């Protein structure tokens, strides 16, 4: 197994923000939302927090997929949030009014609480101390909160890493290709995440390896 190499926790450089805003992640983002819908056919309740929302990709899809929910997107990078806000305002008025945004870095004791669902896409690998994510989820969750944390998983070898970069980012702009490789190096293995959950006293959450590069943590709190 490759040794983990951390990367910067925030993505706020102008070239990064512009590249991620312009990139088309719609297929994988929509697939994640549909996976959530299949796993939780009763829905996500009425208040969802998207931790590390970036430019708002998942938050926007959530308010379109479930007509009754309100979503709070949280991110530490102000330039990413500016893109998310603009995208939200471009939606229809009903969907736009169910979106709100908060600039925050974890851990943050001032985060709103009482959420019926907590989701996150590609935040975990950015965190130098991953435990802050699991503690933050416990902090913001209402009883019975649905949890879905989706992220990359670290490859076993340098050879496997380079194969993934060429398979999934060969034609991407240089900044995205560079960041993708760095993210794979910073990601956790499924075994490491399982250990994190035990340390956080969240044994009810499951860890699933998906496709050739992802892991998803999912479940429902007591």
Regions flagged by a language model, labelled:
Residues 1-18:
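N-terminal, positively charged/glycine-rich alpha-helical extensions of SAM-dependent methyltransferases
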Residues 49, 57-108:
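Class I SAM-dependent methyltransferase SAM/SAH-binding core
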């Amino acid at each position: 197994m490759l040794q983990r190499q951390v990367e910067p926790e925030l993505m706020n450089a102008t070239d990064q923000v512009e590249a991620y805003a312009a990139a088309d992640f719609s297929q994988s983002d929509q697939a994640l939302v549909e996976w959530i819908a299949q796993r939780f056919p009763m829905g996500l309740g009425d208040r969802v927090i998207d931790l590390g929302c970036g430019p708002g990709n998942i938050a926007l899809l959530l308010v379109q997929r479930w007509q009754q929910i309100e979503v709070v997107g949280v991110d530490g990078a102000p330039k990413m949030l500016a893109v998310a806000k603009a995208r939200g305002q471009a939606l229809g008025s009903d969907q736009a009014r169910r979106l709100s945004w908060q600039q925050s870095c974890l851990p943050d004791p001032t985060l709103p609480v009482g959420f019926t669902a907590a989701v996150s896409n590609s935040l975990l690998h950015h965190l130098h101390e991953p435990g802050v994510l699991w503690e933050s989820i416990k902090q913001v969750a209402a009883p019975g909160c649905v949890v879905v944390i989706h992220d990359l998983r670290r490859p076993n070898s340098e050879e496997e890493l380079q194969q993934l970069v060429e398979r999934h980012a060969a034609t991407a702009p240089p900044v995205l290709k560079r960041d993708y490789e760095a993210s794979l190096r910073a990601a956790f293995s499924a075994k490491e995440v399982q250990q994190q959950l035990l340390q956080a006293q969240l044994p009810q959450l499951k860890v699933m390896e998906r496709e050739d590069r992802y892991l998803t943590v999912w479940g429902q709190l007591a």
